[in-house]
Amino acid sequence: MVIPALKRRLEALREVSGGKVIVGVSGKDSLAVLDLLHRAGFELHPYHLYIVPGLEFRERWLRWLERRYDVEVLRWPHPDLSYLVRHGVYRHPLPEFPVLEFNDVFDGLRRELGAEWIATGEKMIDSLQRRGMMKRHAPEYLERDRRVAWPIADWNDRQVKAYLRQRRIPLPPEYAALGRGWGGSPFEKEAIRWLRDKHPGDFRRYRLFFPAVEAVLYHEV
């Protein structure tokens, strides 16, 4: 990543956003974006998308971020939660429950936080589909119609991890155990076992929302 190119990209984002940006904080890529924008002097409005609200292992992490960056992180339901509730995944279904898409969530965040532009940690290397979509918006990586920015679109995972190490930003706690963020697969056996064994209070809370979640541990692939 060439530093002058990154600076030009951030200046382009500042120009369209007025320096006021919504940014997620849940995974390693979004953390790099949060820190880059903070260092560049943007007014940040961070959010965290949850499947189950109020998990203490996650709340401790969010409180640490709030202290480090002097911000308040908005807790907001992940769009996947609407699908899980409607279709009864490890719980009773609610067939009339409305299913939301990410664009619905983004619109809700804009209304709640009072900013228009959203910066995400998505990268071209993540998938071929994402690469094709993002390359159309190079070199600024601003999707103006949707008001979405990808500041690290041309980074790779090695660069992201190196940046976080340099900035002494620890990964969320589940990375040490699972090697990835929690949000990628909230019902994967490995993740649920980790929650049950290491964070039993949070596991009990998970069961309040998804009473049959323990079945994950006994499912044979």
Predicted regions: what they are:
Residues 1-221:
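Nucleotide-activated chemistry modules centered on ATP-dependent adenylation/adenylyltransferase
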